[in-house]
Amino acid sequence: MEYKLPMKVKPPVKKDGDIIFHIDVKLVNKADEIALGLQYICNRYLYGQGYRKLMGDFFDKMGLHSGTLIKPFIISSHVIPQMSFPGDIDFLIIPYENDQLILSKALVIELKIIRAKFIKQQKSPNEYGFSQAKGLIESGFPYVAVMHLIISDESPQSHWRDVLIAKVVDAKSGKIELIETIKKDMMPISLMERGFGRLVHNCPDERIGLLATYFAQEKAGNWLPCGKEAKFNDKCTVGILDKIAEYYYQNYTTFLDTRKYPPIKKD
């Protein structure tokens, strides 16, 4: 199924250094779900890696003039009036290409924050988010995913591992040069792999995409996420896609435009 409509209107372009969201500092300090979710979609590299995991081949085939329109934390009934569960949609993501909304590839994500600690790495989450994801499937969204965004403290340095640092000599051939060995806290990798394994084991529906992402607060660098591609929901209808489009047309200024490629600079 492929269903597209004209974009008609575009949100304002947010460039590097622009203010995208104003977040209450109290929410940031307590690592609230909304604060972390907003910070996550502002990290365009990390967001893009997660989107690629969830949408697979579709992402790889997106062209030069393509991207995604992201709307965080929506009251569900504002999109589908008769919808009551879940009460909100954490992320609504509409891809576009060449000024066309690709509505049949719209993705909704149920977000859960996993607060891990070194001394309790084995602890399972109280909720996985699958009941909400099943509600999103029943409501007819074309693609549905559950995302666990993981935060943690650091491991004691005695538990850090040796890792190699390399530099790229030739990007085309893939040739690298090993530089040195350093000590690195690799707990984020363990947390993501363990968290993803739990998601896979507990997932009740193969249509639900799965994503385990580590979010490094106030630290440099990103960790590549673990994920499984979402599958098309056969309960999706053109009527639902039209409602998604109508919501975008009425609220487009509140969406974040994240392009797949940087804009082409004109001479």
Predicted regions and their residues:
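Charged, often low-complexity linker/regulatory segments
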Residues: 1-64, 229-267
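Conserved catalytic cores of phosphodiester-cleaving nucleases, focusing on short active-site segments
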Residues: 91-93, 105-118, 136
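Nucleic-acid nuclease catalytic cores
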Residues: 125, 134-218
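Surface-exposed intrinsically disordered loops and tails
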Residues: 52-76, 175-185, 219-228
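Active-site metal-binding core of divalent-cation-utilizing nuclease and nuclease-like domains
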Residues: 56-107
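Active-site-adjacent loop/helix micro-motif of nuclease/hydrolase catalytic cores
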Residues: 116-129, 155-156
